Swiss-Prot record:
Its main location: mitochondrion. It comes from Saccharomyces cerevisiae (strain RM11-1a). It comes from the Eukaryota. Essential for respiratory growth and required for maintenance of mtDNA. Required for cell survival in the absence of prohibitins. Keywords: Mitochondrion. This is Genetic interactor of prohibitin 5, mitochondrial. One of its GO terms (cellular component) is mitochondrion.
Amino acid sequence: MASQVNALLLPVIESTPLHQITKVALTTTLTSKQSDYKFKEIAVPLTKSLQLYEKAQRRQDLRASLKALESIIYQTHFQWNNPLPRHAHLFQKHYHFLLTHWPFENHRDLVDSIAVNNGKLNSTSSRSVWLKADWITLFNVKNPWVQTPPSLMRLSGTDLDTFTPERIFLINSLGNHYKFLIANSHLSYNHKKYPSPGVQIPIRNALGEVSPAKQIAQLFARQLSHIYKSLFIENPPLSPENELALTAVFYDETVERRLRRLYMRACARAYTTTNADSTTEPLMFHCTRWEVD
């Protein structure tokens, strides 16, 4: 199937006004050996964008044509051909640890604490708490609702709750990543505002009861899915390799001003890590700016 689709897509890619660096990245990604699922993840949205581009060209709709090309540029260099940062791989590796230690706020306990706190509601759900707090401290409490699967229990020599150096690196890198995107809201996908990342466990009824444990466990799973999507799919940091590739595009003297501006718009949300090779110090992030005419 992949070879048949590529036979249709590759000539269309070559006919676009995109820079050769983007065309090569697209071609390499499409023709590399991968599962049908991974291929479809790229081929389906790419086909839609190319169809939009061709239709816009026939209608002589310049705005729609440029929008389609912007989408292809962003997806190529930021998503399809962009290696995940180290803490994304660790997120997957230590998923169960995050699931059982992800910070939460139980609304039942919150209500019960009002009397103790002189009628004050001491909530930890505000973004300011997450922006100022030491994230390791926030992760110290293990939640009682997520059960450890038997398959993990049987793993010999594995301490599921230990704050290993790798897990500390992961948590602090996630904290830096979240704080960076909050501080640079212009980078967010569709101008999305990031709420507090803690799990909220609501009161289910007037009696003050909360949901069954299984449903609460699902809240944690959904929140981790949302966090991963926000940090690594919708707003992924640009890899150092891709930053260099795009820099080559911007400083290519043969590129026309209109094409350079197209790339500038497509890459307006670019940011990258300042210490991508670090294995001990948590990752830090900075906005990428290309000073071009």
